[in-house]
């Protein structure tokens, strides 16, 4: 995180859970040393700098060098993303599974080299008085990025299906916890979202891409549903479509996990 007022860059690190302050000459010093294994994310609002950690999913408010206080200890085992604006903090607190372990021929246990398993995502809001409220939950995947728009709407990126959700934290923005898909891309992970410019932008991983969001509607769109396991012999029903424009349906069935 770049602090223009202090002309310093703050860097969150692991595995020792330290936040470093780096001046324009490249000199660094430890600004905060957490008891947690990793500091995963930083966010600022005015003079306050916030840090999210793994292990116990704690959010700290950093008021100065080695001056920190706990904002909240969230359920889960990591705070992956933070966003702060006008006294409100948005927190992505995930419950991530432990890495799979495999045993080699020499009986040494090591982490398996495969795509990480998705966790369970929880989106929280902390108000200016420190009250925490859960706004949204996602049991089929975890959250990886956050941003707060001018009207207080929270944009939350997913780490499994390449979607960004719009979640309204206030009654005039759709009601607490009301979520709708805002963006859906082919890439699997949404890693960062920026709403500070003329047009929102976001970056993805697996694979890497940079997107700019425009107001124009796309010429065409594709939506793929999740696989439905009927668990016994089943028969197709009927598909109905209500709306304008040309639409095409394609279906697939079979006896495998992914037909």
Task: List each language-model region with its residue ranges.
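Conserved beta-propeller blade signature
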Residues: 8-11, 48-51, 89-91, 153-156, ...
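Residue-level signature of beta-propeller blades and closely related beta-rich strand-turn architectures
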Residues: 15, 55, 95-96, 160, ...
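A short loop-to-beta-strand structural motif that recurs across blades of beta-propeller domains
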Residues: 17-20, 58-61, 114-124, 163-165, ...
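Surface loop/turn motifs at the tips and blade-to-blade linkers of beta-strand repeat domains
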Residues: 31-35, 71-75, 135-139, 182-186, ...
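Short, conserved, GDST-rich strand-edge loop motifs in beta-rich repeat architectures
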Residues: 94-118
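Non-cytosolic beta-sandwich-type ligand-binding/adhesion modules
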Residues: 216-259
